[in-house]
Amino acid sequence: MAQVDLLNVKGEKVGTLEISDFVFNIDPNYDVMWRYVDMQLSNRRAGTASTKTRGEVSGGGRKPWPQKHTGRARHGSIRSPIWRHGGIAHGPKPRDWSKKLNKKMKKLALRSALSVKYRENKLFVLDDLKLERPKTKFLKEILQNLQLSDKKTLIVLPWKDEGYMNVKLSGKNLPNVKVIIADNPNNSKNGEKAVRIDGLNVFDMLKYDYLVLTQDMVSKIEEVLGNEAGKALTE
């Protein structure tokens, strides 16, 4: 199995963590990663752009002048697309831009992105990362200890509790940092809370240079992506 250094918030090595080769050390499939990002960006589009055709713009329906004997060009309507204030030919109309990707391809894309970070030595795993209260200064000090203070960094935390939520709030004022809580507390199946990694996505993992996970987050990712029966329910 692949191994990664386990660090504390002071940046000190406190151990070595074995991680799944199937999740963190596969040959990246860049085509599937592109498909995932294309799906993400397409699903963000509102699709509300709209223009009026010649049948929708205001204006009379009569012919502006006789067909012949005026010396002027032939026209049948002032709403023609070639007229000022006329309709728009082939303009945009509201449409649904959303795309879908099957679960196997989603999981392959996520494993590929995680493997890219691991192979480029841009994956940091902490034993834990919680703050007693939201304070940007505290999170900034932790990133300095990891030598990531001036790097674009994505932090992914496993669930919503007070300590992790304080980290998320603390990261809002740091321009190069994004904090994701990969959990949906409202999700349940048969009365039991299902394991999910909502929020973890390929676009953010590629956009940010470094990826910071907690030990619990690694376990959660491996539980969801480490077997074909798991469900990687992300955006």
UniProtKB/Swiss-Prot annotation:
Which GO molecular function terms does the record list?
rRNA binding; structural constituent of ribosome
Q: Name one Pfam family in it.
A: Ribosomal_L4
Report if keyword Ribonucleoprotein is assigned: yes
Q: Spans of biased composition, class Basic residues?
A: 65-75
Q: Name one GO cellular component term.
A: ribosome
Cite the InterPro entries for this sequence.
Ribosomal_uL4, Ribosomal_uL4-like, Ribosomal_uL4_dom_sf
Sorted alphabetically, the keyword list is: Ribonucleoprotein, Ribosomal protein, RNA-binding, rRNA-binding
Choose any GO biological process term that the UniProt entry carries and state it. translation
Region (Disordered) spans which residues? 45-75
Function comment: One of the primary rRNA binding proteins, this protein initially binds near the 5'-end of the 23S rRNA. It is important during the early stages of 50S assembly. It makes multiple contacts with different domains of the 23S rRNA in the assembled 50S subunit and ribosome.
Its subunit composition reads:
Part of the 50S ribosomal subunit.
Family per record:
Belongs to the universal ribosomal protein uL4 family.
Q: What is this protein called?
A: Large ribosomal subunit protein uL4
